[in-house]
UniProtKB/Swiss-Prot annotation:
It is an enzyme of class 5 (isomerase). Keywords: Isomerase, tRNA processing. Could be responsible for synthesis of pseudouridine from uracil-13 in transfer RNAs. This is Probable tRNA pseudouridine synthase D.
Length: 407
């Protein structure tokens, strides 16, 4: 399975600084920022969860188990990297004291009362990232060039596609095309990079033997096992997929949408089309205090293009790219032609997003083409560089670093 972010174009031509990230979890620190309005009403307890080497969902489940509640009773606003030190808010609407929970590499601190947290209830994240063994002398030129071009390309990072097994976008496309058996073969059968269960996956890909897979797939592959059991009951891979929780099904479709967005952005760079200047036919997103308001969009025409470009210069608007779906706002003119080309080359049509089973249907939307990190600063320590910046939700720090490091 090819790297879904490997061939994407860089915006800057300056050489990268190289180096390594995430050598140690402490090299990648993430602190979540949520709206203050969360604390204005509500009776749920809000805690800061500090974790290291834990996936968010695994940490939530372990905490829930320790206090005797179902994990769905603990709310959270966003998922965070595993190989990192992360601080995020969680909520629980029960009279329990999470500060008493003792789990290795997890700390919990009560910070007040508020409304229950849900996915998406965050403004963004502060990052402190150490890049080791780099060439810091090359940094000023790449930073200056990125500033001149309006920021960094807002690619979806590898996390969106599966870091150790980058198959989510492939599964998403096959589901969209109604090829459920092929989608199942990829999801169940493609091995990862030295992961437990890889050999069982390989055998399934070769033999398609469901009974053998059920004997050999480890118990922790619970979604895969649930699908295999459902297929055995029904003989339908479509029904087997629908046994999965809605958030998991949506990950597949979101991943394919993200893949297409990345292709659009890369193609726009390749064709020399601007990212920080609107063209007639573009859709722009309103920006308030540095935060893109992705649901507030307006179309660029010959009549308003100068006004829109003034707004972009003033930091009040950003050019957007497509998150394809059955209700997304289409570009026109040159940007619209590019959108049509990307869809055509992928072999999908917009109506496919509506023909999906209900839990997978996606209306689509728009996403800004550039990342403009706020409070951006860096410090050089010998061959290491320590970066600090804030990014709005849904934006990947690794995409900023990709442009700076170019490795």
């Amino acid at each position: 399975m090819s790297d879904p972010v490997g061939g994407l174009k860089y915006l800057t031509t300056s050489p990268g600084i190289g180096g390594k990230i995430k050598v140690y979890p402490e090299d990648f620190i993430v602190k979540e920022v949520i709206p203050k309005s969360i604390f204005k009403a509500g009776k749920c307890k809000i805690y800061i969860l500090k974790k290291k080497n834990w996936e968010t969902m695994a940490a939530i489940k372990e905490i829930a188990k320790r206090v005797g509640v179902h994990y769905s009773e603990i709310g959270f606003a966003g998922t965070k990297d595993r190989h990192a030190v992360t601080y995020q808010y969680i909520s629980i609407c029960r009279d329990v004291n999470l500060e008493e929970v003792k789990i290795r590499d997890i700390e919990l601190k009560f910070v007040g009362y508020g409304r229950p947290l849900k996915l998406g209830f965050l403004l963004g994240n502060f990052f402190k990232i150490r890049v080791r063994e780099s060439n810091p002398s090359l940094l000023p030129s790449v930073i200056e060039e990125a500033k001149e071009k309006g920021g960094f390309p807002n690619y979806f990072g590898i996390q969106r596609f599966g870091e150790k097994r980058s198959v989510n976008h492939v599964v998403g496309k096959l589901l969209l095309l109604g090829k459920y058996e092929e989608a199942a073969e990829v999801f169940l059968g493609f091995p990862g990079k030295g992961m437990e269960g890889d050999e069982a996956r390989r055998k399934f890909l070769e033999t398609k033997d469901v009974d053998l897979a059920l004997r050999e797939f480890p118990n922790f592959l619970r979604y895969e096992r649930a699908m295999l059991y459902r297929y055995k009951e029904t003989g339908s891979w479509k029904k087997a997929f629908l046994v999965l929780p809605r958030p998991i099904l949506r990950i597949f479709i979101h991943s394919f949408q993200s893949y297409l967005f990345n292709l659009y952005l890369s193609r726009r760079i390749e064709e020399g089309l601007p990212l920080n200047k609107a063209l007639p036919g573009d859709i722009v997103i309103q920006v308030k205090k540095g935060i893109p308001l992705r649901k507030r969009t307006y179309r660029v025409t010959e009549n308003n293009v100068d006004f829109v470009n003034r707004k972009i210069k003033e930091g009040e608007a950003m050019v957007s790219g497509p998150i394809f779906g059955y209700m997304y706002r289409k570009g026109k003119g040159i940007p619209g032609r590019l959108e049509e080309e990307i869809l055509e080359e992928a072999g999908v049509k917009l109506e496919y997003f509506k023909k999906l089973p209900k839990p997978m249907r996606e209306p689509g939307g728009r996403r800004e083409l550039l990342i403009r990190p706020m409070k951006f600063a860096y410090k050089v320590e010998d061959r290491d560089v320590i970066f600090r910046f804030f990014l709005p939700k849904g934006v990947y720090a690794t995409s900023v670093l990709r442009e700076i490091m170019k490795n």
